Amino acid sequence: MNSLSNLLDNKISVAKIVNSHGVHGEVKIVPFTNVKDVITNLEEVLLYNTSTRNFFFSKVLQVKPLNKFFVLNLRGIKDMDEAKKMIGYEVFIDKKDLPSLNSEEYYWYEILDSEVYYEDGEYVGKVEEIIQTGANDVISIKNLEDDKEVLIPMTDHYIIELKKEDKSIIVKKIEWYENGTNQAD
């Protein structure tokens, strides 16, 4: 018998259903990726509601862009009432179905939970969250020992080395941030 964790093994959440769209059972999703091909090439998905722990497998019949959202036509969802029941479900795909990236690019799941160290070897913490700011991503690093949060921009200036395979990141220390005051004033 398959457990839920087995069901989600090797899968990655790429979007969340946020609304129904139209009267024919389409759903509006917000993507969790900037790589549009991940969404536009969807074929088969696992829809999973983390609150109710319900899941639903479906074939994607059509994908349409809609501003910063996408609209999906899914097999088995035939009308607006059925589509509204899917609000809150996350859209999962197999990790193997993700498009390949060059060595400088990464998917968020590849760096979440990575161990972060300063150049001198001092442990900073683990990547807990990635924040999109518009200009560049920022990693939120949490150290469980002292409950400190450190924010580091994901730019070449601050990221010295990122090893996706080892889940480790070497970063440049932001002196004013570490001292607790803005020394630039």
Swiss-Prot record:
A Pfam family it matches: PRC
GO BP terms, alphabetized: ribosomal small subunit biogenesis; rRNA processing
Family to which the UniProt record says this protein belongs: Belongs to the RimM family.
Lineage: Bacteria, Thermotogati, Thermotogota, Thermotogae, Petrotogales
Name of the protein this chain belongs to: Ribosome maturation factor RimM
Keyword Phosphoprotein: no
Annotated InterPro entries: PRC-brl_dom (IPR027275), PRC_barrel-like_sf (IPR011033), RimM (IPR011961), RimM_N (IPR002676), RimM_N_sf (IPR036976), Transl_B-barrel_sf (IPR009000)
GO molecular function: ribosome binding
Domain of life of the native organism: Bacteria
Places the protein is found: Cytoplasm
Ranges in a coiled coil: none
Domain PRC barrel: 103-177
Organism name: Petrotoga mobilis (strain DSM 10674 / SJ95)
Gene that encodes it: rimM
